[in-house]
Design a protein with these regions (language model features):
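Conserved protein kinase catalytic core
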Residues: 89, 132, 153, 285, ...
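Helix-rich C-terminal or lid/interface subdomains of diverse kinases
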Residues: 167, 229-233, 302-307, 311-318, ...
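Active-site acidic catalytic loop and adjacent metal/ATP-binding pocket
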Residues: 44-52, 180, 256-310
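ATP-binding pocket architecture of kinase catalytic cores
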Residues: 37-233, 237-242, 268, 272
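Juxta-kinase regulatory segment immediately upstream of eukaryotic protein kinase catalytic domains
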Residues: 1-39
Length: 430
């Protein structure tokens, strides 16, 4: 049997977990995987291990002196989670990835405490940054030791819950999102991008986990950097070939050189920003089936600072809150904030989707969440995002997707995308 990429390194990762424990004078009674499947063919973003300790970890092991960490409770900790950050994960920038993850969790914990909410973000006890980006050398993986939270995966239960229970959970989610949006950004962390720690342990601006490059001062610069990132990717694509055919690449460069993005975003508040979770979905939440209460908000691996609209473009797909993946009727209601009248002739599944999206919209309003209908220039931002999507569409830029098509189909998809790209450029005078 051929082992996939994750199985091949399993024993090496297990050895790293043992070494991490030894470095903290701890010994495992049992080590098991979390959210792991041997059938999954692609590299995991992270490898999670549940560690049951032979003796409780005390403050001597976890003193809470490292930036962003919490001291072990006086009665100790018997079970911990160790997360190994996989530098081979697709599209990940490892520069200050672990630091960003830890710092964001620390800020959200503070914000939730300030809001008087239950502490749903697990405490972090220790961490280590990635030292190299060699995917084979597991000893150099960055890692985080954190508190284990109990509960079942919300995504496995949410669709089967009664509407009343869904509404209760959606309100809890809205309160959490409000706390994330209202995180007080430290004085040194006010740029668009990620966060990290400086030499004195203070949280400052840093690189974002899904974008290589230094943080920037405005949203226009942020969106340009995203476009540049797409262009770098397509330059390496054997199918797209940097859009050089028919001189499309030259037209794209003219658009960028003429401050095209800035002109499109002229009605946008280019300095409006807050913390973005980046993957705020039910599969990153745990809840108690009996009380219907959330017990954990997880996975801040993709978090960054940007315009609040970004959250609604990369999260909330499973509760009717994403403006890029919903049906047209729900999308229009999200953008307007008006769910008064459902569209006619909906099938049963669509009715349920509408009801959940409406309940989520109601919860956001009740909890004071900044939503798309409250944000200036949404249409202009989405227009620029359309360009970004055309520059490197998933079915042309992803190696695994390309393997599913023959040369003729690839050429057809490329030609279709090129035509749409030219149409977009012509609409904007290029």
């Amino acid at each position: 049997m051929v082992l996939n990429v994750s199985q091949r390194g399993f024993q090496r990762r297990l050895a790293v977990v043992e070494q991490i424990l030894q470095s903290h004078d701890l010994r495992a009674l049992n080590i098991s995987t979390l959210a792991y499947s041997e059938e999954y063919l692609y590299p995991f973003n992270n490898y999670l291990f549940k560690v049951e300790l032979a003796t409780p970890a005390l403050s001597s092991s976890f003193p809470g002196t490292q930036p962003g960490t919490t001291q072990a409770p006086s009665d100790g900790i018997s079970v911990i989670v160790i997360k190994l950050s996989n530098p081979a994960a697709t599209g990940i920038n490892n520069t200050n990835r672990v630091e960003n993850d830890v710092a964001v969790q620390y800020l959200v914990r503070q914000s939730m405490a300030h809001a008087g909410l239950p502490q749903l973000v697990p405490a972090v006890y220790a961490w280590m940054p990635t030292t190299i980006t060699n995917a084979v050398n597991e000893k150099s993986f960055g890692w985080i030791i954190s508190e284990l939270r109990t509960g079942v995966d919300l995504d496995s239960e949410f669709s089967s819950l009664k509407m009343q229970d869904k509404e209760q959970i959606l309100e809890q989610m809205a309160n959490v999102l409000k706390a994330i949006q209202t995180v007080e950004l430290p004085e040194g962390a006010t740029k668009f991008g990620g966060v990290t720690f400086d030499s004195k342990g203070r949280i400052v601006s840093g690189q974002a986990p899904l974008r290589a490059g230094e943080p920037v001062k405005s949203y226009a610069e942020w969106r340009v950097s995203k476009l540049r990132g797409q262009l770098q990717e397509v330059a390496q694509s054997p199918v797209i070939q940097g859009w050089k055919h028919n001189g499309v690449d030259t037209r794209i460069e003219k658009f960028l050189a003429a401050n095209g993005p800035g002109k499109i975003l002229s009605d946008v508040d280019l300095h409006q920003k807050n913390l973005i979770h980046g993957d705020f979905k039910t599969n990153n939440m745990l809840f108690d089936k009996d009380t219907k209460k959330l017990t954990a908000i997880l996975d801040f691996d993709w978090s960054y600072i940007s315009n609040p609209l970004d959250e609604f473009m990369c999260s909330l797909q499973d509760v009717g809150g994403n403006i890029r993946q919903e049906g047209k009727e729900i999308e229009a209601a999200i953008l307007s904030g008006d769910f008064t009248w459902p569209p006619p002739n909906l099938d049963k599944e669509s009715v349920e989707q509408w009801q959940v999206a409406k309940a989520w919209s109601t919860a956001m309003k009740k909890c004071g969440v900044v939503s798309p209908c409250n944000i200036r220039g949404v249409d202009e931002i989405r227009d620029l995002l359309h360009l970004q999507a055309l520059l490197c569409p998933y079915n042309l830029g992803n190696e695994s997707m390309l393997k599913q098509f023959d040369d003729k189909k690839r050429a057809e998809m490329r030609a279709k995308t090129e035509a749409e790209l030219i149409q977009w450029l012509e609409k904007h005078g290029f």
